[in-house]
Amino acid sequence: MNEDPKVNLSGLPRDCIEAGTPENISAAVPSQGSVVESEPELVVNPWDIVLCSSGTLICCENAVVVLIIFHSPSLRAPMFLLIGSLALADLLAGLGLIINFVFAYLLQSEATKLVTIGLIVASFSASVCSLLAITVDRYLSLYYALTYHSERTVTFTYVMLVMLWGTSTCLGLLPVMGWNCLRDESTCSVVRPLTKNNAAILSISFLFMFALMLQLYIQICKIVMRHAHQIALQHHFLATSHYVTTRKGISTLALILGTFAACWMPFTLYSLIADYTYPSIYTYATLLPATYNSIINPVIYAFRNQEIQKALCLICCGCIPNTLSQRARSPSDV
């Protein structure tokens, strides 16, 4: 009898296999009722744990923003509606990451895979579209500074919200409606069950929106520099003060756009060039920074906002600190 220690076809420990030798046959099979099948050990991918933890942090942060905007009647301006849309999208994205972890290890089925990927695609798409809508709102509020705050602006904001959530929902429904690779693995992208074509459309759409945001922020920088120069002339500020204020505004815009690109660009480019045959570690390594964007968004767009800070202080302690009530708005607050 030739025994190969490298092959274990039964899936049982080695001492159970050795019990099947002739000298141990009586001990190996005492009776039919005493045979116990061993259950396969559940192995959890550390990357999935990190993604689930990231989703939990995303949910906690953005839930606070959603509650603040919903609870405060004063936060009903178009800007806060768009910030609320961004927070809601990121909240759903974090929830999707948590559900994906639960379904992947407890309720594995084709239906749960499609529902989870649909939720994640729709929520992250809504998040990116909300960022673009916020950029458009900032540009228009500076370009039409005297006439932007009107009923017409509110209507335009609602139209943008309906369009971005409608488009994002359609993108999320594509895998559920049949555009997936569950039946043909050769068409899979780096994120199963998304097809390669589906991932390419999402990536190209992101690059288009990033280019549009870049162009808008360049125009915003020009407007901020012009406004800061006019304010300096009217109030007889020193050139140094004008330079510092303008530099702060441009630095803020560079931080916003740079963070967005650093988080999403690696996964976007990787989705275009890679497919399901590539090692999954590359997918995790590029997808994880994309989730960090939803962690950073509340800090950049919500918690830095003076009105949201006031509302948060009112909810938590019932008062507004003097530093917030006396702070003047400057051109760097864009």
Swiss-Prot record:
Residue ranges in the Cytoplasmic topological domain are 70-78, 135-158, 221-252, 304-334
InterPro entries associated with the record: GPCR_Rhodpsn, GPCR_Rhodpsn_7TM, GPR12, GPR_3/6/12_orphan
User: Is Cell membrane among this UniProt entry's keywords?
Assistant: yes
Q: Which GO terms describe its cellular component?
A: cytoplasm; plasma membrane
Membrane topology value: Multi-pass membrane protein
Q: What is the annotated localization of this protein?
A: Cell membrane
**Which residues are sugar-modified?**
8, 24
A GO molecular function assigned to this protein is: G protein-coupled receptor activity
Tissues with expression: Expressed in the brain, pituitary gland and testis.
Q: Does the keyword Transmembrane helix apply?
A: yes
Lipid sites, type S-palmitoyl cysteine: 317
Question: Where are its TM segments located?
Answer: 49-69, 79-99, 114-134, 159-179, 200-220, 253-273, 283-303
Carrying Phosphoserine, the residues are: 330, 332
Q: Which UniProt keywords apply?
A: Cell membrane, G-protein coupled receptor, Glycoprotein, Lipoprotein, Membrane, Palmitate, Phosphoprotein, Receptor, Transducer, Transmembrane, Transmembrane helix
An annotated GO BP: G protein-coupled receptor signaling pathway
Q: Name one Pfam family in it.
A: 7tm_1
Cite the ranges annotated as topological domain Extracellular.
Answer: 1-48, 100-113, 180-199, 274-282
Which Gene3D superfamilies does the record associate with it?
A: Rhodopsin 7-helix transmembrane proteins
Role summary: Receptor with constitutive G(s) signaling activity that activates cyclic AMP. Promotes neurite outgrowth and blocks myelin inhibition in neurons.
User: Which family is this sequence assigned to?
Assistant: Belongs to the G-protein coupled receptor 1 family.
Q: What is this protein called?
A: G-protein coupled receptor 12
Biological source species: Rattus norvegicus
